[in-house]
Structure formats: C-alpha cells, structure tokens
C-alpha cells in the first residue's frame, strides 16, 4: 500500500502546471550584442578593420559576427553553419589554421577563433601568427597604464609559460598561478581582488 501512495505522489509531482517552464527570449541575442558593444570605449573604432572570425559552428555563430559588424568592422565569418554535429569540427580555436589561412588570403587586419561554447579564444595577427592565451594576456598587460590596485597582478595557471611569467614581472605586475581551468582562475582573481587572468 505504501508503494501505491508513493507512486501516486510522484505522479502528482509531475503534473504539468507544477513543472518549470522553458521560455525562448528572441531578443536575448540583441540584448547581449548591445551589452558587448557597451564595453568598448567610445574612442576605440573598428571602422576600416577587416576581421576573419571563426565561430566553430557553435554558440556564438550569430552574435559574434553581429557584434563586430555593428562596431563597424568588415567581418569575414567562417564556422557559422552549425548542424548539431559539427561544433568544433576542424574549426575554431582548436583548429586555428583555417583562420590563419583566411587572414592571409583576405589580407585581414587580424583573426579571431572561438571555441564552440565561446569561452576560449585565440587571435591571429595580420601575418597569420597565432596568439594564444599567454600572448593575449601580455598584450593586455602591456597596454594597461594602470598597474595598481585591482590591476597590480595577473593570474595564470600551471600551464602558463615561464617566459610569460618573467615578462609580466618585468612590466611590474605580481603573478600567481591557479590550477588549470577557468573556474580556478576566476576564484583566484576574486581572492586576490585582481582583474586580469586567463589560461
């Protein structure tokens, strides 16, 4: 008898009006595009830039090209035809050679290769050279004139290049290593009160 009561209660718990509901927000992409554009300083212009952008047939295949186009760049997009199976397949940040080729072929100013869920990026310079996480962090650190308070240190990981660490210290930054993974980098950034970290 107790099994019967339990099953009846389980069925009652699964009544449709008691379940959560999924909703599609069609304007969410537009809102995200506007947010991203709002983070670009007003004195930074993308006009006249030609960018090759590989979206890895993933989550960013619509919004990323739109962001750069709306900022004024000419965007040559690849990896923007997801079919549910081809995410990261021979494209994106794990296969940047396509972007490297296109940057040279299209005479682009630079290239961007994302991964399928949009949380990893590598850059390609106009000569087709790959810039990985350490390179990108160094460029950001070098360009930053404020090296105090939240900008006084940088978080890398156990995978960060020792040459990168030495170069960062020569710029006057403190440097600490977190365990591998964006979660660990984020946690250490919060703990230290710093703004820049990556892997």
Report residues per predicted region.
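Short, exposed "boundary/linker" segments that immediately precede the start
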Residues: 1-4
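Proline/glycine-rich low-complexity loops and linkers
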Residues: 8-12, 16-34, 126-198
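Gly/Ser/Thr-enriched, mixed-charge loops and adjacent short helices
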Residues: 8-12, 16-104
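Short, glycine/acidic-enriched loop or turn micro-motifs at the edges of active sites
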Residues: 57, 116-120, 128
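Accessory "access/gating" subregions that flank catalytic or transport cores
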Residues: 106-110
